[in-house]
Amino acid sequence: MKNEQPMTGRESLELISAMIVDTRRRYHFEDGRLHLFWGYLDIAVALLVWGVAYFTQSVWANLLWWLIPVVGIPVSRLLSRKSGSKGYALSYTDRMISSMWRYVGFLSFAFALICLLFSFGGHPQVWMLMFFYSFLVVGMGTAVVGLLLDYRSMLYGGGFSILAGAFVLTATIAESPLLEVWAMPLFIASQAAMFVIPGHLIYADTRRRAENKTAGDA
């Protein structure tokens, strides 16, 4: 039995490029829709929380944030099941990105559980922690995916979210009145930057590729 020849530097780069292209193709099949779904869901729930909190002046309005995982997880699974990416073998890049988002999801439940426990202890204001999670953790995850797949819209969107999170965190520490004015608008803007804008760009690129393929087959 012959020993396998080690890969050259060029072959390694070609393999990595092929995995990235293959993962990008899967993003064009399903993640355009998933990005749009999560982005618009987050924005809708944020507006709902904002409105309820404004009219009731109650911090318990933050419990409405649970609508995001309660609605989002089953619907996103349904969208993934219906996606056209079935039948493709998962590459290392796919598994790495999937594992990263699972870890991000685990952190969201861990953070939410901490907030819930402190809320029952009479400190409902701790739900602000979920803002920092969304800005910083999700922003970092989005930026990493943008770097891995060379999606500049996701890289810039994640970067915007991280910077917005740094502003909100600083305003919280400084007890600045800017927090009440800018926290929710920045959250909504960050969701649009991370999910809605990249989702529309990916969806438009998918349609353009499909039209070019149809024209080429004709």
Say what each PLM segment does.
Residues 62-71, 122-136, 185-189:
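Structural signature of hydrophobic alpha-helical transmembrane segments
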Residues 28-114:
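Selected alpha-helical membrane-embedding segments in polytopic membrane proteins
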Residues 142-218:
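Terminal transmembrane helical module of multi-pass membrane proteins
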Residues 22, 76-94, 140-149, 196-203:
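C-terminal ends of transmembrane helices
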Residues 100-158:
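Membrane-proximal helix-loop-helix units in multi-pass membrane proteins
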Residues 1-32:
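N-terminal juxtamembrane cytosolic/stromal segments of multi-pass membrane proteins
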Residues 50-61, 115-128, 171-182:
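Helix-coil boundary and interhelical linker segments in multi-pass alpha-helical membrane proteins
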Residues 41-48, 71-75, 114, 138-141, ...:
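Membrane-embedded alpha-helical transmembrane segments of multi-pass integral membrane proteins
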